């Protein structure tokens, strides 16, 4: 299912788009999580959705299903990179069991020295096995490398405004199967139709999901400290701390703090962990 507007569900199959409605028990139990962008569905001859197949994953904000990658896109300059937001999006990806990648656009704005400095600041990504791509949509640098990486996958893009997401999507997409404006016209909703996540076919194969849903992202609904720690890969691949239930905050003999002191774990990542734990402690209490 590639798009939903006012009760109509647009399903792509073999290069065609079908305007569908929910049927039977699906219609009776309809809610915002019932049939979402990315769902694999079965449709009947009368264009009714009769079955929604089991999901690989489900993002809650934005609401999309069966995603392979979360592409976290930022600009090297104008606006400058928000490292805390990168960490929040990484946390979100790990929480929903979606593979993250980081894309930095506008590298043509940087001097050689600034580019070296940027790579150093983002070196923590390699330590946690997150691929990074440095691109310039304006100068067509690095775009084909990302396209080949995302080929035949379903990718949702997250990041702030002004970082070139539209230019990047325009490079990736094939001719749109059915534009939002065309759907709006058919439904006589006009150009002001509220648009949620929209699934766009890529010319190399696969889909890119354009969504406004990351604008108000928050810390996910993590249930306890152990779960939070599990979402920081760099905390897991080191020797055990002195205490089995170490919080990595106050305890002596903490190997996470030792790794931070030795610059083997990013201090910014560790500070983000502490800040997130504080937020969650307030939530849990």
From Swiss-Prot:
UniProt entry tagged with the keyword rRNA-binding: yes
Principal location: cytoplasm
Keyword hit for Transmembrane helix: no
Sequence positions that bind Zn(2+): 241, 246, 248, 254
GO biological process, one term: ribosomal small subunit biogenesis
Residue ranges constituting the CP-type G domain according to the UniProt record: 56-217
Top-level EC class as recorded in UniProt: hydrolase
Subcellular location: Cytoplasm
Pfam families: RsgA_GTPase (PF03193), RsgA_N (PF16745)
Record note on quaternary structure: Monomer. Associates with 30S ribosomal subunit, binds 16S rRNA.
Family recorded in the similarity comment: Belongs to the TRAFAC class YlqF/YawG GTPase family. RsgA subfamily.
Protein name per the record: Small ribosomal subunit biogenesis GTPase RsgA
Organism: Fusobacterium nucleatum subsp. nucleatum (strain ATCC 25586 / DSM 15643 / BCRC 10681 / CIP 101130 / JCM 8532 / KCTC 2640 / LMG 13131 / VPI 4355)
Source lineage: Bacteria, Fusobacteriati, Fusobacteriota, Fusobacteriia, Fusobacteriales
Gene name of this polypeptide: rsgA
